[in-house]
């Protein structure tokens, strides 16, 4: 969950029980927003996602979601259209080369964007993300 101006953005993983693919359920994330002034929910958007952990960050006045779009070896960045969630777009999907759990994104004391994550739930890594090169 992330509050930006008068909106509360909410993202959680859900499972889509697809009757066509009876052998397994397709994972996806449920992205929506609650307007704190009008007290209304926006129409939710489904985002391909494979784990229940994600994190929001604001960069250059834009809202982004870091999550696992394909499997736990991938990290994805979704640029969120704060005025129309359906207009949100995938900015990046990268293979991390090993399992990547619990991404947490924050700015350091030099205002550089950093992401910590665990590898195989055993080791914690810290990476610097140069968002200016990605957007």
Language model regions located:
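Beta-rich carbohydrate-recognition and catalytic domains
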Residues: 1-52, 58-98, 108-112, 118-135
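C-terminal regions of proteins
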Residues: 99-103
